[in-house]
Amino acid sequence: MSSVTDGVVAFLGPAGTFSEQAVRAVFGREAKAIAEPDFDAVLDAVESGEARFGVIAIENNTNGTVTHALDLLLERRLCIVGEVSVPVVHNLLTLEKRLEDVRRVYAHAQALAQCRGWLSRHMPDAERIAVSSNAEGASRASIERGAAGIAAIVAADIYGLRAAAKSIQDGEGNRTRFLVMAREPEMILETPKAFKTSIVFSVPNVPGSLYDMMTPMAENGVQMVRIESRPARNGFWDYNFFIDVEGSVETPGVREALAAMEARTEHWRLLGSYPVVD
């Protein structure tokens, strides 16, 4: 858990989201947290100084990367200062007593995708409606007859719903990674056990350029744990590449690998070198 004891933390609300669970996992149950309607508003709060930190989902191990969050890492001039992984257990919450009376299912698009198989088997005719968060879906289900939301079980108590079905996500071990964002680099753990370093870069659109970028990591024994690409939006089919590697930028091997890689890029930015919260 973080050693930080002051400052506001912004997260994707309303209350009862997995984002709020991530906040509590990092900063504790007593942390002062504010719910925001979307990722942009979370990072707006950090940039404006309303919040010291912002917590956003970046990747789910079942459904992949949250692409909007990835784009925001490039668009905003903020730093990643921490990461936490939260187990995701989705539940179907409703006012209805019978599953067949549910005609609409509200949830975040990621949750709908993560429960696609279960919904197709058990509720093939129910309309699936994407909303800004799972908690918003639960909130809607609490005021609409014939509606259900997919959310964490804590949302059932918050919104006065019953769990018509529990653990409806496709596959076991479903987890989501969340990033902690801040205006400036800072250490949020006193005794971190593991570090990651994240960068974004672009390379010339010529044969072998991306391969050349990878060689310094192999030469310096640096383990890459993730690579993603996103369109550069310049009209020329160019891409920005996001890479996570194990280790701190202060580690000699990582530092030397990144220096060699930066020299081969057209655009380069260190997004953060940060602790991974247990």
Regions found by a protein language model. Give the residues of each.
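Domain-level signature for soluble enzymes in the chorismate/prephenate branch of the shikimate pathway
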Residues: 1-278
